[in-house]
Amino acid sequence: LQRSKTAREAIKVMTTIANTYGYNSEGETFTICDPNEAWIMEMMGKGPGSKGVVWVALRIPDNAVCAHANQSRIGKFNMKDKKNVMYAKDVVSFARSKGWYQGKDADFSWKMAYAKPDFSGRRFCDARAWALLNHFYDMSPYLDWALGKDPNAKDMPLWVVPNKKVSVADVVACMRDHYEGTPLSVADGTDIGGGIWQM
């Protein structure tokens, strides 16, 4: 990142280095910011026998709050929006070559092709993103997704426009959240098999 002056440059540097030297990871999500822009990028190594990565990066709107927690969050994205979206040239074709996606480019969802959320991903990871976003936006329509039980539940938005100005104290409160006061709370001693997961 020291080689970059902007978030856009950092994305190009990171993906160029990973494509040149390889990247041994099942997938990572990065928040990359500069004084003017914030981006969320997801990147995955191509696996044994292949060097390089597939990746996608989306610019988070200036008026929005975004959250991610150990689970792929980027779904569908507008491949024509060059101002706010960057991606590997083979982001769709690589998924097709592996048999992970067969549809049209316009319907492609990164996370459904490369890291489809299962119960654990939703209940223990997306739930933490849900809790953070719930501080700034009514996330109740997406509770079933965060609970992880219904495979057809309404997916969460990647970001939300907050219902108030976000302060440093608000962010601190988010990081201390344990789902108190929500159906995700385990404060009553409910054993969900994983204990209390903190952000």
PLM features: residue spans?
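C-terminus-biased signal that marks the final domain/tail of proteins
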Residues: E9-T15, G22, E26-E28, D34-A38, ...
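Short acidic, glycine/serine/threonine-rich loops at helix termini
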Residues: E42-G45
